[in-house]
Amino acid sequence: FPATEYFSNNAHRCYFFTATPKHSRTTEKAGMNHTRTYGNVICQVPAPTLVRAGHILPPKVEVYKSRILKKDELVADRDCEQMIGAIDNIRKDKVLICAKSTKQIVSLISRTEFVSELAHRGYSWMMITSKTGAMIDGEKVTREEFFDTLNKWGRDYSKRFVVLHHSILSEGINVNGLEAV
């Protein structure tokens, strides 16, 4: 926030674009409602309007019911079973999995057979969170390399991959060629 405030105060013109504006009730925390830094809202378009105009695609939600954990079963094992089952059912080459926490992603890839099950099906995988950084097929990479690879794989019709991301609706991520979320 201090960097944004600095550039905003020292620029002749400054514009901010976001699909998910963040607001704060206090001036100590960053919030796009702080007009001294961000200015007034010039234009705000609701997502349904953008969908109707054909500018963005509507979300297609496919619901899978979660079963109750078995005695002594780890949540990550159940998540693995459900995610692999969903990938098998939707039969798409490019899949985005949205997790509720970084811990959930880390548990899924480190404590279960998820990664080996993906490999068995011909999928690569990638993840990025603010806590862990970026990773592609188990190798730590820079953010730049992550997004370059994401775009490259997204344009490659033959590439099968899964992106694991935390809080996708609040952060946002753009995946070329994405077929299923």
What role is predicted for each listed range?
Residues 2-56:
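Post-DEXD/H (motif II) to motif III coupling segment of the RecA-like Helicase ATP-binding lobe
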Residues 10-13, 38-40, 56-60, 121-124, ...:
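Short glycine-/polar-rich loops that comprise or flank the Walker A/P-loop
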Residues 23-28, 135-136, 173-174:
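Switch/connector loops and helix/strand junctions flanking conserved nucleotide-binding motifs
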Residues 39-106, 111:
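Conserved interdomain linker/interface between the two RecA-like ATPase lobes of SF2 helicase motors
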Residues 54, 162-181:
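SF2 helicase motor core recognition
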Residues 102-129:
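Conserved helicase motor "Helicase C" RecA-like lobe of SF1/SF2 P-loop NTPases
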Residues 122-170:
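Conserved helicase ATPase core of P-loop NTP-dependent helicases/translocases
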